């Protein structure tokens, strides 16, 4: 799976007739990493959901749609319009905070050790890449702020999987929008 994402990233970047900048390369890697994490999150949630009885699955879907995640108190765009209107710096900063918050919670994902280790590793790599992108895209508006405190709330499996899936989708969306805004030649449709 990693090879496929890396290959697609290289192919997409290679299509452009212009030389690839370090910023473009970092964005391609970051988008590939978060797409992988989002796929893992969807699979974990789906596997968990499939392990339940039909009635429990219905209940899980009701609960998951109303679930409060630890990241819900982060200031972030709430819809497509607000996301597209946000600055690249804001999208990168929110993405960084979401990924950083999952470094802790990923240790509690009830999955195989290999999956948990791989997720933790990818989150760390993505966090470092996002930090480089934030630094590279500073627009003179000041440094990155880590002002809000992460609230650590105990979660059950269903909440953890649902929140992980939701947050990885957010980060994937934010990074894709930021990349498309910075590199219009990437032929993005939002």
UniProtKB/Swiss-Prot annotation:
Membrane spanning stretches: none
Signal sequence interval, chain numbering: 1-17
The entry's keywords: Disulfide bond, Hormone, Secreted, Signal
InterPro entries per record: 4_helix_cytokine-like_core (IPR009079), Somatotropin/Prolactin (IPR001400), Somatotropin_CS (IPR018116)
Compartments in which it is found: Secreted
Example GO biological process: positive regulation of growth
Disulfide bonds listed in the record: 69-163, 180-188
One GO cellular component term noted in the UniProt record for this chain: extracellular space
Gene Ontology molecular-function annotations: growth hormone activity; growth hormone receptor binding
Assigned protein family: Belongs to the somatotropin/prolactin family.
Protein role: Growth hormone plays an important role in growth control and is involved in the regulation of several anabolic processes. Implicated as an osmoregulatory substance important for seawater adaptation.
Protein name: Somatotropin
Organism expressing this protein natively: Paralichthys olivaceus
């Amino acid at each position: 799976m990693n090879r496929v994402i890396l290959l697609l990233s290289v192919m997409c970047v290679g299509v452009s007739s212009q030389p690839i900048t370090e910023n473009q390369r970092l964005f391609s890697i970051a988008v590939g990493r978060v797409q992988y994490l989002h796929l893992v999150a969807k699979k974990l949630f789906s596997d968990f959901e499939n392990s339940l009885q039909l009635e429990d699955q219905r209940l899980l879907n009701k609960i998951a749609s109303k679930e409060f995640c630890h990241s819900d108190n982060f200031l972030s765009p709430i819809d497509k319009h607000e996301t597209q209107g946000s600055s690249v710096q804001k999208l990168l900063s929110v993405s960084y905070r979401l990924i950083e918050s999952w470094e802790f919670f990923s240790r509690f994902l009830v999955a195989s050790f290999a999956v948990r280790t791989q997720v933790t590793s990818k989150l760390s790599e993505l966090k470092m890449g996002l930090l480089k992108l934030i630094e590279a895209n500073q627009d003179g508006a000041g440094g990155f702020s880590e002002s809000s405190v992460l609230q650590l709330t105990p979660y059950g499996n269903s909440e953890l999987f649902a929140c992980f899936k939701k947050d990885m989708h957010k980060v994937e969306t934010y990074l894709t929008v930021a990349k498309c805004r910075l590199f219009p030649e990437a032929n993005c449709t939002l």
